[in-house]
Amino acid sequence: MNQSYGRLVSRAAIAATAMASLLLLIKIFAWWYTGSVSILAALVDSLVDIGASLTNLLVVRYSLQPADDNHSFGHGKAESLAALAQSMFISGSALFLFLTGIQHLVSPTPMTDPGVGVIVTIVALICTIILVSFQRWVVRRTQSQAVRADMLHYQSDVMMNGAILLALGLSWYGWHRADALFALGIGIYILYSALRMGYEAVQSLLDRALPDEERQEIIGIVTSWPGVSGAHDLRTRQSGPTRFIQIHLEMEDSLPLVQAHMVADQVEQAILRRFPGSDVIIHQDPCSVVPREGKRSMLS
C-alpha cells in the first residue's frame, strides 16, 4: 500500500507543479498584454501554486520515509505540516489580491485587449479542471491530506478563472470596475479556503480522531467477534496514510490466556482487512476488572 500511496501522491505533486509552471508563463504574457488586474490576481496565484506544490512534493517524499529510532510512528505528520504551510502561502496571496483589487477599484484602468485575456483564461480553466480531476482520483485512492489541500487550492483556481471570464466579458462592455470587484471576491474566497485548510491541518497535528463512520465500523467489527463480550477505550488518529487504532477488549475471566491472545489477533486481522496499513494495538481485559478500571467513551 505504501508504495502505491507514495507513487500516486508524488505524481499528483509533480503534475501540480508542472501545470502551475506552464500556466504561470501563459499568465505573465496575458497580464503584460492586457493589463487586467484579474489576470494579475491569477498570475500571483500561480506563483503561490508553484511554491505550494513544490513544498508538497518535498514534504510528501519525506513523509513516506519509514519509521526510525527517533520517529517511532513514522513521518506522516509532515503531510499536515505541508497543508499548514499551504494555508499560509494562500493567505498571503489572498491579502495581495485584496489590496490590489481595492487599488484598481479606486483607480480603474481599461484593458487593452480583453480578447487575449479570455483565450488565456479558457486555456487555464481547462488545464486546471483536468488537474483537479486527477487530484480528486488520487485523494479517493490515498486519502492524502497534502493532495487534498492542493486539490482544494486548485478548485478555488477553477472558480477564479470562471470569475475572471465574467470580469473580462463585462470589461468589454465598459464595466472596468468589474475587473477589480471580481479580484476582491476572488481574494476573499481564497482566504476562506486557506483558513479551512489551516484548520484541518491543525486538527490533524492535534491527533483528531478518525471520522465517526470509521470508528463505528471498528466498534462493529470488534463487538460482533466471537469470544469478545464488549469493548471500551477506543482511541484513533491518523498520520499521513497510516491510521492508528487502539482498543480494549472485554473477555470472560475463565478464557485461557492463549485463547484470549488468539481472539485478539483475529480481531486485529479483521480490522486490518477493513483498514489496510493501519497500526493496531489491542489490550485484553477480563470482564470482572472493567467496572473497577472505569471506561472512557468508546468514540474517543
From Swiss-Prot:
A Pfam family that the UniProt record links to this protein: Cation_efflux
Q: Any idea where this protein resides? A: Cell inner membrane
Which Gene Ontology terms of cellular component type are present? plasma membrane
Q: Does the keyword DNA repair apply?
A: no
The domain of life is: Bacteria
Q: What catalytic reaction does the record list?
A: Zn(2+)(in) + H(+)(out) = Zn(2+)(out) + H(+)(in); Cd(2+)(in) + H(+)(out) = Cd(2+)(out) + H(+)(in); Fe(2+)(in) + H(+)(out) = Fe(2+)(out) + H(+)(in)
Keyword annotations of the record: Cell inner membrane, Cell membrane, Ion transport, Iron, Iron transport, Membrane, Metal-binding, Transmembrane, Transmembrane helix, Transport, Zinc, Zinc transport
Q: What is its main location?
A: membrane
Task: Write down the membrane topology.
Answer: Multi-pass membrane protein
Provide the GO MF annotations for this entry.
Answer: cadmium ion transmembrane transporter activity; ferrous iron transmembrane transporter activity; metal ion binding; zinc efflux antiporter activity
Q: Which Gene3D superfamilies match?
A: Cation efflux protein transmembrane domain, Cation efflux protein, cytoplasmic domain
Listed transmembrane segments:
12-32, 39-59, 82-102, 114-134, 156-176, 178-198
Per the UniProt entry, what is one GO biological process? Answer: intracellular zinc ion homeostasis
Question: Which annotated residues bind Zn(2+)?
Answer: D45, D49, H153, D157
Reported function? Divalent metal cation transporter which exports Zn(2+), Cd(2+) and possibly Fe(2+). May be involved in zinc and iron detoxification by efflux.
Q: Which family does it belong to?
A: Belongs to the cation diffusion facilitator (CDF) transporter (TC 2.A.4) family. FieF subfamily.
Query: What is known about its subunit structure?
Result: Homodimer.
According to UniProt, the name of this protein is Cation-efflux pump FieF
Lineage of the species this protein comes from: Bacteria, Pseudomonadati, Pseudomonadota, Gammaproteobacteria, Enterobacterales
Q: Please state the gene responsible for encoding this protein.
A: fieF
